[in-house]
Amino acid sequence: MNLLPNIESPVTRQEKMATVWDEAEQDGIGEEVLKMSTEEIIQRTRLLDSEIKIMKSEVLRVTHELQAMKDKIKENSEKIKVNKTLPYLVSNVIELLDVDPNDQEEDGANIDLDSQRKGKCAVIKTSTRQTYFLPVIGLVDAEKLKPGDLVGVNKDSYLILETLPTEYDSRVKAMEVDERPTEQYSDIGGLDKQIQELVEAIVLPMNHKEKFENLGIQPPKGVLMYGPPGTGKTLLARACAAQTKATFLKLAGPQLVQMFIGDGAKLVRDAFALAKEKAPSIIFIDELDAIGTKRFDSEKAGDREVQRTMLELLNQLDGFQPNTQVKVIAATNRVDILDPALLRSGRLDRKIEFPMPNEEARARIMQIHSRKMNVSPDVNYEELARCTDDFNGAQCKAVCVEAGMIALRRGATELTHEDYMEGILEVQAKKKANLQYYA
């Protein structure tokens, strides 16, 4: 039993030695190292120890440098944070330049580091009306900047710290309709054809664009609604704004007539720029005849300014860069005095006429405005419609209001047919009376 370990131990020792030799060969230890004397191996070991110490000191130095760089980065980040919290100086980007310096400096010549930078540089104009060249743009990526952008810069170094949102005139921002109107197409009587034409030209291209793409047709850019006063042009525009999810901007023609030269044209530009930013959007211009009259020779500066405002409107309607996501709805009572350039195809493509309501339409209008009232069952709307000849939609609504006031005056709980007849007489008296006042 005791002989087995003595027999196996030499074999095991040889295997271990073979393993050591294999590892030595794998580790790249040459035969010359194995043939070295003890003193040489001790000397080699001391050399390796010294190299290890040198490498450790190098690692320690690199670690210190890394920590110093981290501290510097932290300090710079805090400086940037402090600078960014300061009030910005508002500026506009005038131009972006590509800088590629030529290496033609003589040996020993002084070299300006700013002049040797490569990449993008910027020219800005501050709100203090000063222009600066920035060899280093700042914290904003140069690829995200374009001429005309509004930026915030440091008031001392003028480095660009942040891009600011586009500035629009406060009057243009007030034109945006925040609260949706409550009118619906069912609240409009006698204008079924006009509603269909408006939906086809404005609503369908926004909600179902693929239908036009499948047919290969281009939808109309704008709609002109014209007709006598009180026929429902503005009411239909409010219903269109309520039924679409697009941004709705309401302009009035007299708003665009300003005292200072170029102010009206700037309002038009800002309105269309805001509409493009918030596309899809609808611009409704009421009383277009205030600025869209035919051009004529005039020596008055006011007339020329109105014509310049109309020219800017023409350019925005059919400019060099058309936008299919912005639709224009214009309304006017005097289509006969509009400039032919506004009426041509390509600007206000579809013209929708709003005629005076016929007998059936007048009956429908009075039914719509009376549906929330306590009306007696004996009210005959067809007879009322026959009695309201030459009434427009607004006057038919006024008849319902007057009938309600008459019923309220006599303390009734419901409106009768006679109340409506008296209301018709009241509206006719207001319509036909010719009052003259004497001092």
Curated annotation (Swiss-Prot):
Its main location: cytoplasm. The modification Phosphoserine is found at S9, S376. GO terms for biological process: blastocyst development; modulation by host of viral transcription; positive regulation of proteasomal protein catabolic process; positive regulation of transcription by RNA polymerase II; proteasome-mediated ubiquitin-dependent protein catabolic process. ATP binds at G227, P228, P229, G230, T231, G232, K233, T234. The modification N-acetylmethionine is found at M1. Sumoylated by UBE2I in response to MEKK1-mediated stimuli. Keywords: Acetylation, ATP-binding, Cataract, Cytoplasm, Deafness, Host-virus interaction, Intellectual disability, Neuropathy, Nucleotide-binding, Nucleus, Phosphoprotein, Proteasome, Ubl conjugation. GO terms for molecular function: ATP binding; ATP hydrolysis activity; identical protein binding; proteasome-activating activity. PROSITE patterns: AAA. Pfam families: AAA (PF00004), AAA_lid_3 (PF17862), Prot_ATP_ID_OB_C (PF16450). InterPro entries: 26S_Proteasome_ATPase, AAA+_ATPase, AAA_lid_3, ATPase_AAA_core, ATPase_AAA_CS, NA-bd_OB-fold, P-loop_NTPase, Prot_ATP_ID_OB_2nd. It is found in: Cytoplasm; Nucleus. One of its GO terms (cellular component) is extracellular region. The keyword ATP-binding applies. Component of the 26S proteasome, a multiprotein complex involved in the ATP-dependent degradation of ubiquitinated proteins. This complex plays a key role in the maintenance of protein homeostasis by removing misfolded or damaged proteins, which could impair cellular functions, and by removing proteins whose functions are no longer required. Therefore, the proteasome participates in numerous cellular processes, including cell cycle progression, apoptosis, or DNA damage repair. Belongs to the AAA ATPase family. Component of the 19S proteasome regulatory particle complex. The 26S proteasome consists of a 20S core particle (CP) and two 19S regulatory subunits (RP). The regulatory particle is made of a lid composed of 9 subunits, a base containing 6 ATPases including PSMC3 and few additional components. Interacts with PAAF1. It is linked to Deafness, cataract, impaired intellectual development, and polyneuropathy: An autosomal recessive disease characterized by early onset of deafness, cataract, severe developmental delay, and severely impaired intellectual development. Patients later develop polyneuropathy of the lower extremities, associated with depigmentation of the hair in that area. This is 26S proteasome regulatory subunit 6A. The lineage of its organism: Eukaryota, Metazoa, Chordata, Craniata, Vertebrata.
